[in-house]
Design a protein with these regions (language model features):
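Post-J-domain flank of DnaJ/Hsp40 co-chaperones
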Residues: 1-35, 66, 180-183
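Intrinsically disordered, low-complexity linker/assembly segments
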Residues: 40-183
Length: 183
């Protein structure tokens, strides 16, 4: 049983990234100070799909107080900031989409913005109930180790359309009366 190899102390820093950075990966600049007071700058490649709280270790960029010992490591703790429209669930993303109840009844296609800023045409089937969650395969986060990509889950929120003209209200009332007379 050999003695453990001694080395200089590790240094830990925290980097805050966005959910978009998780989706696509990002190079960031990490700035930190060693015990000696030396200011260090490191170019850090944050991998795609990294988890909140995960620590990335970079060997040999830590403390160097004792020159006779190997340099310590740099431990980079990742904090993923909350996103206004998307929530992460492992490899999956979750979002909400407000659709008026007439479109839910009749069916429609709605353009929704993806995490990357693109547009996705989301098919709303006829008779969809508010609160239904639609799954869009392949629009989640990709795990770089496995190549697996999660889904985008869209929760449909029903909203009442703005009926400010008397004619519109009368048409909806007539439809309501007709549907109620059938049941």
């Amino acid at each position: 049983q050999g003695r453990p190899i001694r080395q200089n102390a590790d240094v830990t820093i925290t980097i805050r990234i966005s959910l978009e950075d998780v989706m696509f990966g990002k190079n960031v600049i990490g700035r930190y100070t060693l015990r000696s007071g030396e200011e260090c700058v490191a170019n850090l490649a944050i991998p795609q799909g990294i988890e909140n709280g995960q620590v990335v270790q970079i060997r040999g960029l830590g403390d160097n107080t004792h020159p006779q010992l190997p340099r310590g490591n740099l431990n980079v703790q990742i904090i993923v900031l909350a996103h206004a429209d998307f929530e992460r669930d492992r490899l999956h993303l979750r979002t909400k989409c407000s659709i008026n109840v007439l479109e839910l009844m009749l069916g429609d296609t709605k353009n929704i913005t993806t995490l990357g800023g693109g547009t996705l045409a989301l098919k709303i089937p006829k008779g969809l109930n508010p609160g239904t969650i639609l799954s869009v395969p392949g629009y989640g986060i990709t795990d770089v180790r496995t190549g697996q990509t999660g889904n985008l889950y869209v929760e449909v929120k029903g909203i009442t359309p703005d009926l400010d003209r008397y004619e519109d209200i009368a048409k909806v009332q007539a439809l309501y009366d007709e549907l109620n007379s059938r049941s």
